[in-house]
Amino acid sequence: IAEKYPQGCFDMIFADPPYFLSNGGITCQSGRVASVNKGGWDKSQGIEKNHAFNTEWLKLCQQVLKPNGTIWVTGTMHVIYSIGFAMQQLGFKMLNDIIWEKPNPPPNLACRYFTHSTEIVLWAAQSIKSKHCFNYEAMKNQNDGKQMKSVWRIKPPGANEKFFGKHPTQKPIELLKRCIEASTNEGD
């Protein structure tokens, strides 16, 4: 897709890459046992190959970002550390790690670890030299006049948000709206 666009054309990118979790496991969705297999695209090829994949798609994103553009990337503990490391290797300027807290996560069926109730959203600028956009006052206004913190409590998307089918890891509109409002200006 990146080849269709000229270099430096986007002010912001929101990426939801594979989490590499399709491993034959199960979860609970709407009170029913469900497979976690999303498809071959989400199956791990091993740590090194997964990291190479993350580095490659991030390179493409970096090329199409404007010099002052930013990227938001979501992930769980299974993939986000590789992504953050790849971003640092590529020279992105790390701005924040947002913790998206889900108030109603699926239950922990294995009972061998804490319930996964968060995802991490990394926010980074195109390079160390970037003078990125941050709409500080707008974020403060959304938080009753207080500075917006890096823990965001947002419900996962409901059925009313799933207009175009059922993407297995669809993000809530409120999450994307906040990212867009924080890091872009009207008309971008």
Predicted regions span which residues?
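Core catalytic lobe of class I
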Residues: 1-188
